Amino acid sequence: MKKIITIISIILIALMFTGCSRRSATKSVRLDYIKENDGFTFKNYAIAIDDKKDNKNTYAVYKKIKSNKYQRLFRLDEEIKKDELLATDTYLYIIKDSNIIGYKLNSTINNVKKVEKEFDTAKDKWTIANVYGFKENYIYVSISGKEDGKESTKFVRLKSDLSATDVLDSESLVPTDLINNINLEK
């Protein structure tokens, strides 16, 4: 009898720990919650304030699971603004100063992949001047910095996974029909 009680206790404790951790990671919220927490909604995803501490907000990313219900995917430990976001069906990009951070969004937290592109390195000092938008798996931006001691602007095309960068010869090569903040619901 003691063995049965011990086994049942171990199983219950294991279920309690695994159940609690899964519930907190996959928290579901309604669209009202997103809006009440200064959220941004996209076609398939949303971002809302997750926590407010010491006058600093942290955000969570949610996947739409029904027309007005979202499932929490992961937490962003940084403060963001709407104009720093670029979203596509598969990526969410946060663009700040000289850095682009992309999150490849899939259905679960285990599948979220973070990618990053830094323009301000020890060798090159560039900042992102303008984000033109997204088209056919490429992000188009302009970067400003010094080259040979002179102020310079370059027009750059990045693959959606930020793995490759092409410097364009001129702004005229940036497509005019780019979509900025694609799928942003207003």
Q: Which role does the model predict for each range below?
A:
Residues 1-4:
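Positively charged n-region of N-terminal signal peptides that target proteins for export
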Residues 16-19:
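C-terminal motif of bacterial Sec signal peptides marking the signal peptidase cleavage site
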Residues 21-23:
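Bacterial signal peptide processing site
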Residues 25-39, 78-89, 122-136, 169-185:
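Repeated scaffold domains used in trafficking and secretory/extracellular systems
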Residues 37-54, 84-101, 132-145, 180-186:
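Short beta-strand elements that form the blades of beta-propeller/WD-repeat-like
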Residues 53-62, 97-104, 147-158:
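Structural motif
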Residues 65-68, 105-108, 159-163:
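Short loop/turn segments that connect beta-strands within beta-propeller blades
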Residues 71-78, 110-123, 165-174:
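Beta-propeller fold detector
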